[in-house]
Amino acid sequence: MSSQGWKGFLASVEVGIGLLGYGTVGSSVNRLLVESGDEIERATGHRLRVVRALVRDTKKERSFPPGDGVLTTDFAALRDDPDIHVVAEVMGGLDPAGRYVRELLDAGKPVVSANKQLVARDGADLFATASAAGVQLRFEASVCAAIPVVKVLRESLVVANVHRVLGIVNGTTNFILSRMERGGSYAEALAEAQELGYAEADPTDDVSGADAAAKMAILATVAFGSRVRFEDVERRGIEDVEPSHVAAAADLGMVVRLVGIATLAGGAVDVRVQPAFVDRSHALAAVDGAFNAVMLQGDAIREITLEGPGAGGIETASAVVADLVSVVGTSGTGFLQNDACWRELERLPPSDWRSGFYVHLEVADRPGVLAHAASRLAAHDVSVAQLVQRLNNGEATLELVLHETSLGELSAALREIATFPEVLRAPFALPVITERVL
């Protein structure tokens, strides 16, 4: 839509909204626009109304019926409708969602997206398309649903020089790990999450860390002003976290959480998602169940934490509507650059990443095993901060908390330790997050 088109619609009270998708989120967006229409009009001077919604099946029963003539299976009809001024993409997936968003931007229609995979993987191309067309592409709902972290980073903290982002950004895995603290296996906790609707029938994207990795790629890109792609994120899921690890964390005054960690130091960026031991004194340790939290650290802010529901139809819809209101309030073109990227930064080699670590070793209970393992750690400048040893029928479990070291040095030491004939299982290691440097 040209600037003349925007001036035309701004002369009227009603703004036409198109929806790509009318499932749980899409119907919730429409519900909010209808039920909160007066509040939106007071804030923007405009009433937002859904004109068309693209669906696969117009006959399907809907939890919030959109009205006669709104549902369509014809994308071109939505794209070319002059009464549609802004479009919300809430269908998910890469295709056809990506193709539709590109065509809408090319047609001059601002787009709001809740699609983390699309923004994380194809964001550079989409932002370039939006900029060329002179319209906005907003994506608050793609990360942490009701937590307005993208807006905070892009607007409120624009001069904060944020250099670290820590986050629990996947509610499914946080629910599973929280339930495992109360007893039970990973499989039992996953089954409960599925029964309650927190986990999909196929939970792979969640439990593998892929969902969280896409969100962290977006957050790191916005926070650091440099493109971080999904493929740049080091990723490890929670599938191999066992009740014994959760119990060991509790004994050490910690909890296990799937944590996203993005760091900018020395001109290099590292972004990763993996289970971690989190000290109970740390703010993220208190994030329970399906909730999300994002901690931002920067020169001008020290540290702030945003917490709230990270998923759900109405929560995601709330973020979509907030972006729609922002688009309308800034006349569609906006005062911010679409793309947050303004510089190129190097990627930190994964082996150079530094942290404290927890290591779990299962060995035969024989003289000298602990000393031998300690010597291998020391040979790689890895020192032990805390040790717990448990004996059971000729076997020993060693729980080690290590001072900060590089991942490369620790990995080299553990590879050597794994070759010991006394080692009964492969060493298991997770980073440790505390309020202090170990």
Features from the language model and the residues they span:
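Low-complexity, glycine/alanine/valine/leucine- and proline-rich hydrophobic stretches
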Residues: Q274-D299, G313-I314, A378-N393
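A short hydrophobic/small-residue beta-strand
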Residues: P110-V112, V384
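Rossmann-fold NAD(P)-binding glycine/threonine-rich loop
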Residues: P96-A107, K116-R154
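Rossmann-like NAD(P)H-binding beta-loop-alpha module
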Residues: S131-D211, I218
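A conserved regulatory-domain signal marking ACT and ACT-like small-molecule sensing domains
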Residues: A319, L324-L438
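N-terminal glycine-/serine-/threonine-rich beta1-alpha1-beta2 phosphate-ribose binding loop
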Residues: S2-A107
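Substrate-binding/catalytic subdomain of NAD(P)-dependent oxidoreductase enzymes
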Residues: R179-M180, E188-A286, F291-A293
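Glycine-rich phosphate/pyrophosphate-binding beta-alpha loops
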Residues: I238, R280, R302-I304, G308-I314
